[in-house]
A protein has these predicted regions:
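Active-site metal-binding motif and surrounding structural segment of the metallo-beta-lactamase
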Residues: 40, 51-98
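Short, charged N-terminal beta->alpha structural module
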Residues: 247-269
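Active-site neighborhood of phospho(di)ester-bond hydrolases with catalytic His/Asp-centered motifs
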Residues: 45-47, 69-77, 97-100, 159-163, ...
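Conserved beta-strand hairpin/beta-sheet module of binuclear metal-dependent hydrolase folds
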Residues: 2-61, 150-153, 157-161, 255
Length: 384
């Protein structure tokens, strides 16, 4: 695939994968992106996941047209991008591996010492001339590993962004809008590191970027302000859309009835409601919704003097990603000693700028008329 006159795509699509990073459902597969800049000197940008080494090397050989690469630039050492460094070195032993000090530490950890006979350790802001193209290296630590760096090509105004601006899905399954699966990817993979992403966005703002070449998902061109704006909202923990995320667990269906009634009452008032059964839905989508919308209602049962396990897991996903700047409400259920609301609220005690609505709904086993009235009040409060 030709990206520009000099930049070629040599990545692969993975349709066999069911769980990315062992946890994220990817029904449309995954793309592992790799690029080549053809110039007086040739630079290969990253490798691909382990199972696709031969396909990747064949793609590379096809675009080289008899030439040999001069550099392999490693932006990110996670194995879905670095697993074939050894195959590359064996195929092209004269090529130079380009990374930073942390990159080479990780290469030694993954492959053992001595793999890279020819290597170039770069620092933040260093440049590398390929001829017409000059690359500037921009370090992006903890977006989302400590060694991550990006490259900016001044000639084609291309930012090679590592995992930033990536999304789930193979490239031959990209009919859907970018936002949804990019959001789920960001919240799951990068969401904890908002401060670090903000630092990268400031660096990017000083560059004249015409295209973004991520390690997952499509190359981004055209009006890049849309993608930059979303990344700014996500990484500053801002509210992307007005609405209420309702996440619930239910043992015998009674808490579910309360959650569904709340969703109905919200929609009757013209408020967007996104509802998730945490035991059955893709939890990553529920996490995505919790960060997308400005308000969150958690509904669960008291369980073993604690809360239902899926709800505890969900809240952990939120708090470990620095959940903040939101309005929260609670629906609890308990037959003899309801304590879920108190427990859930305590789990957010270290979260910043969390506001709690006045209404908490407490079910004692099953829904009552009084509970329905309380849910009406909750819906009214959430829609103000």
């Amino acid at each position: 695939m030709t990206i520009t006159n000099d930049i070629r795509y040599i990545g692969v699509n993975d349709h066999d994968i069911d769980l990315f990073e062992g946890q994220y459902i990817v029904p449309e597969g995954m793309a592992y992106n790799s690029y080549v800049i053809i110039d007086e000197k040739i630079a290969v940008m990253d490798t691909v996941s382990a199972d696709f080494g031969e396909e990747w090397l064949a793609n590379l050989e096809n675009v080289l047209a008899g030439r040999k690469p001069d550099y392999l630039i490693i932006h990110h050492m996670e194995p879905d991008h670095s697993a074939n460094i050894d195959k590359f070195v064996n195929a092209y032993p004269e090529a130079t591996i380009v990374g930073n000090a942390k990159t080479f530490e990780m290469i030694d950890q993954f492959f053992g010492r001595g793999l890279c006979k020819n290597k170039l350790a770069v620092k933040n802001g260093d440049t590398l001339s390929l001829g017409r193209h000059e690359l500037t290296f921009l370090f992006a630590p903890m977006v989302h590993w400590p060694e991550v760096m990006m490259s900016y090509d001044e000639t084609d105004k291309a930012l090679f962004s590592a995992d930033a601006f990536g999304k789930f899905g193979a490239l031959d399954c990209q009919d859907k809008e970018w936002d949804c699966e990019a959001r789920r990817y960001y919240m799951g993979i990068v969401g904890k590191y908002g401060m670090q992403v903000q630092a990268v966005l400031k660096k990017a703002a000083a560059l004249d970027i015409k295209m973004i070449c991520p390690l997952h998902g499509p190359v981004l061109t055209g009006d890049l302000s849309h993608y930059m704006s979303l990344y700014d909202i996500w990484s500053s923990y801002g509210v992307e859309s007005e609405g209420v995320c309702i996440a619930y667990t239910s043992v015998y269906g009674n808490t579910k009835k309360a959650a569904e009634l709340l969703a109905k009452k919200l929609e009757e008032r013209g408020c967007k409601a996104a509802i998730s059964d945490l035991a059955r839905c893709d939890m990553a989508e529920a996490v995505e919704d919790a960060f997308r919308y400005g308000k969150l209602v958690l509904a669960t049962t008291t369980y073993n003097a604690d809360i239902f396990p899926f709800m505890r897991q969900f809240i952990d996903h939120l708090t470990e990603r620095n959940y903040q700047n939101r309005t929260l409400g609670f629906i609890e259920n308990g037959t003899w000693a309801p304590a879920a609301a108190k427990i859930m609220k305590a789990m957010f005690e270290k979260s910043k700028n969390i506001n709690y609505i006045d209404t908490t709904v407490t079910l004692r086993s099953a829904m009552t008329d009084e509970n329905a009235e309380a849910i009406e009040r909750m819906a009214e409060e959430l829609c103000r």
